[in-house]
């Protein structure tokens, strides 16, 4: 990949981030939600991954005291298969540690085996199940976590 950068999300990135969101998720977040997260949520940290100044993915992280939670992570479908998700996830984990996180957790669809495999590479293990967690199809979510 040519010029790859991972950096904090800025308000001016939201349009491109929403484009990724719409391409990836059946029930995408709105511009307003991203604005609130980036501009107003003091516990939230969002990052973008860009190639040649084009945003191709993003990740969200909340850190409350020493508890870190991945809120979302997405890579544009046309950029999958290049390990960008791993790069972005690893960077986000490093930021969680830097921000004082001692534990990291996330939810992942039961059907998303590829994501579960990637999270396991980073040491996350299943810790529970949230029944009917996803509103689009009532799919269960596996809660995964790791000590940082």
Where are these regions (language model features)?
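Extreme N-terminal starter segment of soluble prokaryotic enzymes
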Residues: 3-5
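Acetyl-CoA-dependent GNAT
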Residues: 8-78, 89-91, 95, 99, ...
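Conserved hydrophobic beta-strand within the GNAT/NAT acetyltransferase core sheet
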Residues: 70, 104-108
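Active-site acidic-Proline motif in GNAT/NAT acetyltransferases
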Residues: 76-78, 82, 110-112
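Conserved acetyl-CoA-binding loop-helix of GNAT-fold acetyltransferases
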Residues: 81-94, 117-121
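Short glycine/proline-centered loop/turn elements that form peptide/ligand docking sites
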Residues: 85, 89, 111-115, 132-137
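Conserved catalytic-core motifs of GNAT/GCN5-like acyltransferases
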Residues: 107, 120, 125-142
């Amino acid at each position: 990949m040519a010029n790859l950068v991972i950096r904090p999300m800025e308000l001016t990135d939201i349009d491109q981030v929403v484009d990724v969101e719409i391409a990836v998720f059946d029930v995408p977040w709105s511009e307003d939600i991203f604005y609130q997260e980036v501009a107003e949520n003091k516990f939230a940290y969002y990052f973008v991954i860009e190639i040649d100044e084009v945003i191709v993915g993003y990740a969200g992280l909340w850190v409350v005291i020493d508890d870190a939670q991945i809120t979302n992570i997405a890579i544009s479908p046309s950029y999958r298969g290049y390990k960008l998700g791993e790069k972005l996830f690893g960077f986000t984990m490093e930021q969680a540690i830097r921000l004082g996180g001692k534990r990291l957790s996330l939810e992942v669809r039961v059907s998303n085996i590829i994501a579960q495999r990637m999270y396991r590479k980073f040491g996350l293990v299943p810790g529970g199940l949230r029944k009917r967690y996803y509103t689009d199809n009532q799919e269960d979510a596996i809660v995964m976590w790791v000590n940082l």
